[in-house]
């Protein structure tokens, strides 16, 4: 099997959390107990408790206990990465209050929020006994002790990981887990080259994968086995927030990006429609919201409830937050972008820049305007080249590269970049993740997700309102107001949104008899099963094709 993030597969298969999010259309924000068979939450959300299932156990047969839960969250708060520490910043006490009960409370100076209990419930629980004799701060290649439906059987670094189903998995009969995890073995193969991965699945070396490159999706999977129905090519639409896929983001620690006029000018230079038509086969939609494809996204002008949140900051916000809807800049998609370029040059002039001998120059210092870009992949670098070339045409000097992924992550997390890219896909109940991505608090933490170094009191206020909302209308008012403030500050140059996920696979698998379009997330990994009749059909069909 090959999925976009093999790490995520490992967490899902080997670990266990107290709650699991339901993936069905009609319950987009529901959580069900996995490790927990009971939960209590106070009316003000300042206190909550979980009761752990008494039959839960680790893969070595020892019980999974409340002591493990307490250890996990104390460790996360003290030594977790910046994102985890930000998410749990309001958490105060974590205590064992019974053989099966664990109690949580928030700090006195923090307000209880509806999202915190469920966010806590989705963290993977760690073994206190295992980490008592192993250093959790050290990198290791030894798979840690798990409690999930699978365990690591074998692996070769950089090549594959083989997971084996745990036959006596304690959670098999938990209601939300029934019917899941039907394969005895799951193998995740690693590839360094996308084209080799494409040829591997067409050659039947791997069974299923996500296709992440639009050109390959549109051109590479039309071959005899697909024409005979032995190989499937499916766009699986997800009725959930799509967010923003790989927008250009700016490091606001760089002085030149601190001027909102410069950021808007850079946004105007980007011709998304042209890039989507020419490079991406017109496959994507424009990500016009941080919460694109959801009720959390802004629409029209601010509502009365949004204005209640925004008006106290009228003097601190761009006027257009109140008077205009944020929309994609007008373009014909054929590179005729003169009006937008003219406006971009006006904004650069207002910010103190002019083109001197073909070079965009700071009029006060005489320094050229330059941008050093790093992209997560060679595909993203290729996708970004029309934007970079457009910048070059107005005198902005650029460099661009796609380093090895670990180096890209290090540079983004440590702020060693000027322009970069990021993948942002919110869930249906964002809150702690918003704080990690956009809050002043996270900007001050090393290695947080706030790579842009956004420090905006209005953004902080609106994130708190999202997290504190008790009613749906208040929640949507807060997300929409936040959406407008982020967009009109031009922190990102939006690009595309992904309408679900593109799955290619050999037709050997049974699937639940449900409408797959009505899901909130991917279900193939844990709900499919091996279908002998289908597998035999594929084998016979391939033999026939080879003989023809």
Predicted regions and their residues:
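Ligand-site clamp/hinge motif
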Residues: 53, 138, 169-222, 264, ...
């Amino acid at each position: 099997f090959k999925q976009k993030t093999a790490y995520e597969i490992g967490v899902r298969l080997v670990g266990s959390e107290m709650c699991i999010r339901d993936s069905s259309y009609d319950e987009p924000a529901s959580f069900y107990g996995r490790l927990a068979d009971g939960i209590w939450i106070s009316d003000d959300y300042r206190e909550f408790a979980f009761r752990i299932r008494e039959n839960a156990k680790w893969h070595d047969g020892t019980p999974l206990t409340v002591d493990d839960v307490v250890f996990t969250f104390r460790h996360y708060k003290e030594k977790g990465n910046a994102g985890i520490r930000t998410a749990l910043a309001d958490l105060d006490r974590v205590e064992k209050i019974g053989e099966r009960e664990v109690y949580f409370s928030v700090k006195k100076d923090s307000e209880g929020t509806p999202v915190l209990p469920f966010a806590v419930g989705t963290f993977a629980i760690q073994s206190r006994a295992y980490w008592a004799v192993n250093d959790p701060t050290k990198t290791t290649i030894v798979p840690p002790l798990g409690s999930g439906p699978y365990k690591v059987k074998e692996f070769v670094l950089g090549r594959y990981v083989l997971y084996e189903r745990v036959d006596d998995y304690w959670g098999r009969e938990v209601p939300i887990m029934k019917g899941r995890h039907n394969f005895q073995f799951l193998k995740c193969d690693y590839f360094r080259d996308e084209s080799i991965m494409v040829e591997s699945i067409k050659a039947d070396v791997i069974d299923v994968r996500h296709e992440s490159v639009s050109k390959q999706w549109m051109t590479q999977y039309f071959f005899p086995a697909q024409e005979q129905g032995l190989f499937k090519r499916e766009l699986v639409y997800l009725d959930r927030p799509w967010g923003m896929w790989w927008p250009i983001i700016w490091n606001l620690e760089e002085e030149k990006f601190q001027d909102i006029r410069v950021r808007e000018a850079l946004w105007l230079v980007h011709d998304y429609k042209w890039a989507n038509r020419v490079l991406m086969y017109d496959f994507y939609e424009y990500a016009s919201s941080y919460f694109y494809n959801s009720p959390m996204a802004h629409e029209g002008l601010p509502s009365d409830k949004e204005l209640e949140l925004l008006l106290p900051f009228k003097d601190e916000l761009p006027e257009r937050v109140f008077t205009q809807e944020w929309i994609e800049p007008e373009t014909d998609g054929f590179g005729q972008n003169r009006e937008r370029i003219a406006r971009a040059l006006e904004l650069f002039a207002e910010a103190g820049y002019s083109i001197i001998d073909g070079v965009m120059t700071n009029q006060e210092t005489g320094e050229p305007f330059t941008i050093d870009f790093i992209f997560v992949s060679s595909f993203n670098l290729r996708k970004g080249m029309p934007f970079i070339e457009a910048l070059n045409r107005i005198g902005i000097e650029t460099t661009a590269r796609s380093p090895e992924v670990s180096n890209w992550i290090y540079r983004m997390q440590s702020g060693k970049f000027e322009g970069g890219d990021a993948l942002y896909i919110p869930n249906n109940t964002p809150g702690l993740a918003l704080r990690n991505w956009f809050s002043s608090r996270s900007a001050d933490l090393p290695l947080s997700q706030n790579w842009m170094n956004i420090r905006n009191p209005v953004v902080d206020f609106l994130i708190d309102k999202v997290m504190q909302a008790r009613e749906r209308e208040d929640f949507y008012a807060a997300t929409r107001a936040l959406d407008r403030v982020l967009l009109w500050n031009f922190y990102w140059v939006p690009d595309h949104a992904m309408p679900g996920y593109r799955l290619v696979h050999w037709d050997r698998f049974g699937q639940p008899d449900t409408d797959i379009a009505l899901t909130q997330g991917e279900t193939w990994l844990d709900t499919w099963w091996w279908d002998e009749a289908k597998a035999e059909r594929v084998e016979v069909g391939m033999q026939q094709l080879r003989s023809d």
